[in-house]
Amino acid sequence: MDFAWVKTAFRTKRRRGRKPIGVGRWASLAARLVNPLALGSLAVGLSACALFDFGPPGPDDYPVKGIDVSYYQDDINWRSVVADNTAFAWLKATEGGDWSDPKFAQNWHGAAMAGLPRGAYHFWYFCRPAMEQVSWFLQNVPYDPYALPPVLDIEWVDSKTCPGHPPREAIIPEVKTWLEAIERYYGKRPIIYTSISFYNDRLRGAFPGYFVWIASYKGHPVVRDPSLRWNFWQHTEAGRVAGIRGRVDRNVFNGSTREWQAFLEGRLNPDG
């Protein structure tokens, strides 16, 4: 369950024409909300809390932050990236069955030398058989027991060489083949990266037990779809991080630092 909103719940806010509420008054209010003797019951306190609508948590409210990169970011100073509160990075490795990122090997080595947990991701091509895409990923991404789980990036793109949107019944078996083959080789269950619309249209319910990484630039994933289960959130493609010239995708992990450590050790249940 996500409690990242708690840290923002009692921030001092200046309202137009009014002085900000002091810390003492917030403390008094908090005591009244949680003290059963003052309000009669905890239920009453929770009802009172509901009167304050602070909105969903923002990216800054999640303690574990990371990036994903490709050759578009050019040369990266990975030590500066780590120093800028970056806990993880996924690096584009392959696309389809015949394209590899020209910066992948450099990024793979550089991130590891900087002590940053990093993994590789594959961009799905709908007009290539799953096993060809598996083979291509294996050729380009070395086995490393300390790497983050591989990621499958699957989403709709405008492609002149592969037009059309295959139906769910055509996509699910192919994706399942890729995920299972990659897990057998690397020993870690892959993560599924996608958009909310693609997840709902083509993937929802088909892959229980997999971590889900959602791209949502227009707002918090749960605000856009309250029923959505997500583990990573790509909240912008225009982020700034020390060590990288220009823009970069930024992400957060849906959990505490303790849960992140459990994820790194393979002990975290993706379904909660």
Where are these regions (language model features)?
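Residue-level detector of anion-binding/catalytic polar loops
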Residues: 87, 117, 189
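Extracellular/periplasmic catalytic domains that process cell-envelope and extracellular macromolecules
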Residues: 59-61, 82-85, 113-114, 143-146, ...
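Catalytic domains of cell-wall/extracellular-matrix polysaccharide-remodeling enzymes
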Residues: 149-226
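Bacterial N-terminal signal peptides that target proteins for export
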Residues: 13-37
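Substrate-binding cleft of extracellular glycoside hydrolase catalytic domains
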Residues: 62-75, 92-177, 183-185
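C-terminal motif of bacterial Sec signal peptides marking the signal peptidase cleavage site
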Residues: 47-48
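Functionally critical loop-and-helix segments that line ligand-binding/catalytic clefts
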Residues: 55-70, 199, 207-272
